[in-house]
Amino acid sequence: SKIIKSKIIPIFVSKLQNMIKLGEYNILKVVKIVDFGVYLDGGEYWGEILLPKETAPAECKEGDELKVFIYFDSEDRVIATMTTPKAIVGDFALMKVVGTSRVGAFLDWGLRKDLLVPFREQREEMVVGREYLVYVYVDKTTDRIVASTRLSRFLNKTPVEYELGQEVELIVARRTDLGYNVIVNNSHEAIIYRNEIFQPIIIGQHLTGYIKTIREDGKIDCILQKNDGHEQIDRLAVLILKKLEENGGSLAVSDKSDPDEIYRLFGCSKKNYKKTVG
């Protein structure tokens, strides 16, 4: 049976990739309307794919083309939905753990069937109720959509010729002793140093940033402001004034306060706080 399985899987994967984009949006034609939904043309391999009534358009007819998300339901049937998931295959997204079992943790990704993070794909043991930044992909051995918190292995390790000062899209991935690890343009890993952060940021947040340095080892440093001088200080000053107004003109912090308390309130280092307040 093992030999048969090893022969079947590559064919299955090939068919899957060629016919339907699992975990992504597909444009499929309505071929039949029934009481419990509509059937869509999934091609020669998949045949008719059900779009259940609860997510199907109220008015549609045979021959209409619908943009649908394709995944496996709880009974491992290929199924379509017009509900928008929190992420599709190839995305990084922040999701909450809603359950655990002997196979892994389950995330709420906006669909009826929760998204599995297998134990081997957990950077640390995942806890119900907590949110994690995950990468969504198709497991090639099972052909199931799963997620992983082991983000680094899905990022490009090949150095890219970014230009210094180039504007890039960032996703905040993880807090470290030095600052925050971020994902650059959905592709590369970089760091923003704590003493160069002048605003509160959270895991999973999407930000616009800029390339500050590309080191000899290929590692990337980013900043959130185009200039690393007065502009950041001005932004921090505005934030401090806003906090003062919200608290009747006084704050329970000073340049003698604990650095972590200053960071919690203003998202900056104690050094930058002192520089701003004088």
Report the location of each language-model feature.
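Single-stranded RNA-binding regions, centering on S1/OB-family and related RNA-binding modules
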Residues: 3, 9-278
